[in-house]
């Protein structure tokens, strides 16, 4: 037996016990004739003591230990004279009587502690060392607990966990697929699933009623802090349900996770907001409601006063930052540069301060009387000490999105985006279609199987762009953690949907014939939702990137720098797969 206890569970009550521990050397330090060694495992750290006067040979052996050596020690638990309140084992130490070096180690390329000197690339290259850090390991422990609680909740609600295939057919709609060549079928390819969407619908046709799966999904798309080429979904589907049934079920799951994992209890139902209102009031379909700064439209007030930027604009809108009138000219110039960055794309920024006497001082004073500025102030409900920031443009939707970026930046600067505060809402009534000007055709905003709102079905023939989807997203703190819809279960309605999306009958049959055929054998009304487990965990952990809650993530170029993947295939493998690599310069 390598150990009788772990490095994190000894306490004062264990004083006098003889125990054996095993783990990694965190650090060593010498003080006079004493050597102190911190031994670490997944469970914690324990201080070891070696005494030169008691056993000189053993102490000399301890002096030769390096960082990250793997050791086994046996000794007696004793109360520490100098206690460490920062660790659970800080009241005790182990007086070592026996030391075995199980493995030596090279000097690590970075310090394996809470605060490390390793950059992102270095830590990803040596991810197996980075995972020894307690702060990283805790994220994966949190992930385990959340996945466990998801399974427990859904099991109690009658869901069955069913695995679906990883090798499926490619579907050109949506993000790019990762493709896998088939050796046994030369010239043909599998695709890795972007989601088990059609397969879980088939399970509903099969009569499984309630399905879930914690499943890997794959999308070959450009990466951001909240995206990875492979990610994990909590994928769910239910039969004989309407939208309200799905929302209640998965709001219940979110509340369960918050209560059990974070100790946060939501007694009220989550807020609901239409997509139209979210875009109009916050410029985003995933608004962060931890703070205010709701958009105020100023077309009626600010147009027609000789300021050509506003007079020629299709949209004028602004936000009110409470207490920010103290912003200096330098800070305001920095905000102007922020909105003019290519990532935001605004042409400029107009600001107005509400002075202590209630008067308004703006950057466009020469065009506006105090009477007009007071009317603007009242539209915001602004008070003395507040700062009003205004953007305008010739495209209302685009300008709202720019204003959204400014709002989030102000939220950051004013410390209003507290990671320990959670505001949850459902965004509902999404458009069913998005119009693409370049292609001159509609695309599904979610996917082709999303059911239209029953009230809007007649509009499919007359005004498809006005049709609302029976779809919903769960948004927490400005992060879309989950989304889903009620699905089409009628083959005739599905045919109409494909036609509106530009599918020929042959193409629809080729790509989705298996699903259309299944519908002919009695498909129940059904709907579902998928949570992004990575995003959910990063939200609970207060992380800025989902990479930190994935054991072996890819970098922003989609590479695994530890495995050096993707890599070049051996020519013999290419021959076996009947493939030729011809990279276009």
Swiss-Prot record:
Span of the signal peptide: none
Pfam families per UniProt: GAD, tRNA-synt_2, tRNA_anti-codon
GO biological process, one term: aspartyl-tRNA aminoacylation
InterPro entries from the UniProt entry: Aa-tRNA-synt_II, aa-tRNA-synth_II, aa-tRNA-synth_II/BPL/LPL, Asp-tRNA-ligase_1, Asp-tRNA-ligase_1_N, Asp/Asn-tRNA-synth_IIb, AspRS_core, GAD-like_sf
Chief localisation class: cytoplasm
Assigned EC number: 6.1.1.12
One GO molecular-function entry: aspartate-tRNA ligase activity
Compartment(s): Cytoplasm
CDD domains associated with the record: AspRS_core, EcAspRS_like_N
Catalytic activity: tRNA(Asp) + L-aspartate + ATP = L-aspartyl-tRNA(Asp) + AMP + diphosphate
Residues involved in ATP binding: 219-221, 228, 480, 532-535
Cellular component GO terms, alphabetical: cytoplasm
Similarity-based family: Belongs to the class-II aminoacyl-tRNA synthetase family. Type 1 subfamily.
Quaternary structure and interacting proteins, as annotated: Homodimer.
Role, per record: Catalyzes the attachment of L-aspartate to tRNA(Asp) in a two-step reaction: L-aspartate is first activated by ATP to form Asp-AMP and then transferred to the acceptor end of tRNA(Asp).
Name of the molecule in the record: Aspartate--tRNA ligase
Highest classification ranks of the organism: Bacteria, Pseudomonadati, Bacteroidota, Bacteroidia, Bacteroidales
